[in-house]
Amino acid sequence: MSEILFFSPQPLFSHMMNKNSRLHTHSNIKNTFFSEIGIGISGNSFLLLFHILKFIRGHRPRLTDLPIGLLSLIHLLMLLLMAFIATDIFISRRGWDGIICKFLVYLYGVLRGLSLCTTSMLSVLQAIILSPRSSCLAKLKHKSPHHISCAIIFLSVLYMLISSHILLSITATPNLTMNDFLYVSQSCSLLPLSYLVQSMYSTLLALREVFLISLMVLSTLYMVVLLCRHRKQAQHLQGTSLSPKASAEQRATQTILMLMTFFVLMSIFDSIVSCSRTMFLDDPTSYSIHIFVMHIYATVSPFVFMSTEKHIVNILRG
């Protein structure tokens, strides 16, 4: 399954390892990982609470508020689920049956896919918001709010279908050590797949990632061009200050650009770590580092959003 890990930010923690290998002996890695999960859960909980309070208090929502709130919810659920699974990876075997294993790994796979898709959608929305009135994208500004909810529902169903193969391939870890099993955790394992099925699934994941990341890159480049053009125009208007609306849009765009850049860098880093794992298949340390790297984006992203939200303290104070 190393090909799937290489092509997808939605790995199944598959790792060909001996049952005698105990990841909990690496206490430093374990403590670092659970610290990362704790920080990420706190940050995403705070960001989600902020958007809920913002909605309850009747503040005028922005186009990006729903995707940002959804992204924080996805990351919160994903990190909570990972914390639960990690106890079976790093600490002790929980003795889960096949149904629990299928449910946990399937739900995690869906959440990983939705994280990628929501991030891409957020980048495209910000490009639409920043586009000038003469642009063809400007016509989508008024249509976007009505289609966001439909897009979220459609993508949720789509990723549930894409990840449905997990329900067939995940099973409870057998009592006897079997070399052809891929161990997801101490209680859950991945059944060996045929070369054809593995190749088809890897290709689908690769196409999905190429498409979504290409959308991110194109929308990011488009926003960079617009920001540079806006800055040149501002330099020619001596003595004229930017309006608060333009300033707010510019800050939001810079936040999205920062987040997109960070996401792409983390995807590249994740691919590098995933490739290195193929060279050290029985190394628990490499496996643990990969798990840590996979959740850096979910941990850091809420703090990137909050760093530019000036209304957080005001809303919480009431």
Swiss-Prot record:
Location(s), subcellular: Cell membrane
The knockout outcome noted for this protein's gene is: Mice lacking all but one V1ra and V1rb gene (12% of the V1r repertoire) show a lack of chemosensory response to a subset of known pheromonal ligands and changes in maternal aggression as well as male reproductive behavior.
Q: Name one Pfam family in it.
A: V1R
Asked whether the keyword Protein biosynthesis is assigned, the reply is no
Task: Return the GO cellular component terms, semicolon-separated.
Answer: plasma membrane
**Disulfide pairs?**
101-188
PANTHER family to which the protein is assigned, alphabetical:
VOMERONASAL TYPE-1 RECEPTOR (PTHR24062)
Q: What is this protein called?
A: Vomeronasal type-1 receptor A11
